[in-house]
């Protein structure tokens, strides 16, 4: 199971994604933990079993057990937070004075470098389409000294993984009915 398997599974019309996936997996902008945590978290956020299985297997070879769990923790907490903050944003400030009352302890104690956890949360929030969370995580990353290039590379990784998941879902669905 690997990035190579995903590239091989992509249909011809997704050739750009195949090339982008190969490029992003060799990035020098992100360190290994940042890259593989971002890829794993983004894969889980796509909800595509094949993408998660393939990237998850390769991520396990490139991340410590603690980082692997933290990346999945970022997906879990952002699954809740992205819905909550995106929904609250739709309400145009009418509920901003109310306390969320949601437990988010993993954000304070992720078990890995907090900037890496923020990077993964930023990527997942991008996949999930929560503009409030994307902006908040980007701000935290920049305050922590993470460069614009690294933030942008994580965004590209999330976008590529999301595109791969959509292409594979389309191909699998059409193959099943065709």
From Swiss-Prot:
GO MF entries: alkyl hydroperoxide reductase activity; disulfide oxidoreductase activity; hydroperoxide reductase activity; peroxiredoxin activity
Catalytic function, reaction form: N(6)-[(R)-dihydrolipoyl]-L-lysyl-[lipoyl-carrier protein] + a hydroperoxide = N(6)-[(R)-lipoyl]-L-lysyl-[lipoyl-carrier protein] + an alcohol + H2O
The enzyme's E.C. designation: 1.11.1.28
Cysteine-cysteine disulfides: 130-133
Organism domain of life: Bacteria
InterPro entries (UniProt xref): AhpD, AhpD-like, AhpD_core, CMD-like
Active site: 130, 133
Signal peptide as annotated in the record: none
UniProt keyword Phosphoprotein, yes or no: no
Disulfide bond as UniProt keyword: yes
Stored PANTHER family: ALKYL HYDROPEROXIDE REDUCTASE AHPD
Stored NCBIfam families: ahpD, ahpD_dom
Family: Belongs to the AhpD family.
Function: Antioxidant protein with alkyl hydroperoxidase activity. Required for the reduction of the AhpC active site cysteine residues and for the regeneration of the AhpC enzyme activity.
Subunit text: Homotrimer.
Record protein name field: Alkyl hydroperoxide reductase AhpD
Organism of origin: Mycobacterium ulcerans (strain Agy99)
């Amino acid at each position: 199971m690997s990035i190579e398997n995903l590239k091989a599974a992509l249909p011809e019309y997704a050739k750009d994604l195949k090339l982008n996936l190969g490029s992003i997996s060799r990035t020098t902008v992100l360190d290994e933990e940042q890259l593989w945590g971002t890829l794993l978290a983004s894969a889980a956020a796509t909800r595509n079993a094949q993408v998660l299985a393939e990237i998850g297997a390769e991520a396990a070879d490139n991340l410590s057990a603690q980082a692997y769990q933290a990346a999945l923790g970022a997906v879990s907490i952002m699954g809740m937070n992205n819905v909550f903050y995106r929904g609250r944003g739709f309400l145009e400030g009418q509920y901003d004075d109310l306390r969320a009352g949601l437990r988010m302890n993993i954000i304070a104690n992720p078990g890995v470098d907090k900037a890496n956890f923020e990077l993964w949360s930023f990527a997942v929030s991008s996949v999930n389409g929560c503009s409030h969370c994307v902006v908040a995580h980007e701000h935290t990353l920049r305050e922590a000294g993470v460069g614009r290039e690294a933030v942008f590379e994580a965004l590209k990784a999330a976008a590529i993984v999301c595109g791969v998941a959509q292409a594979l879902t389309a191909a699998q669905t059409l193959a099943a009915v065709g």
